[in-house]
């Protein structure tokens, strides 16, 4: 996942 400190691997979204 590009950018973001934490990202939901399952949804591939930035938190």
UniProtKB/Swiss-Prot annotation:
EC annotation from Swiss-Prot or TrEMBL: 3.4.21.-
Regulation: Inhibited by PMSF (100%), AEBSF (100%), aprotinin (50%), benzamidine (50%), guanidinium chloride (48%) and urea (66%).
One cellular component (GO) term of this entry: extracellular region
Subcellular location per the Swiss-Prot or TrEMBL entry: Secreted
Source organism superkingdom: Eukaryota
pH-linked activity: Optimum pH is 9.0 (at 25 degrees Celsius).
Tissue specificity remark: Expressed by the venom gland.
Thermal activity profile: Optimum temperature is 25-50 degrees Celsius (at pH 7.0).
Occurrences of domain Peptidase S1 (ranges): 1-15
Post-translational modification comment from the UniProt entry: Seems to be only O-glycosylated (is not affected by PNGase F which only removes N-linked glycans, but is affected by TFMS that removes both O- and N-linked glycans).
Key words, A-Z: Blood coagulation cascade activating toxin, Disulfide bond, Glycoprotein, Hemostasis impairing toxin, Hydrolase, Protease, Secreted, Serine protease, Toxin
Molecular function terms, GO-annotated: serine-type peptidase activity; toxin activity
GO process terms (BP): proteolysis
Chief location category: secreted
Similarity comment: family membership: Belongs to the peptidase S1 family. Snake venom subfamily.
Quaternary context: Monomer.
Its job: Thrombin-like snake venom serine protease that has high fibrinogen-clotting activity (2025 NIH units/mg) on human fibrinogen. Shows esterase and amidase activities.
Protein known as: Thrombin-like enzyme acutobin-2
Species this chain originates from: Deinagkistrodon acutus
């Amino acid at each position: 996942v590009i950018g973001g400190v934490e990202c939901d691997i399952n949804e591939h979204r930035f938190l």
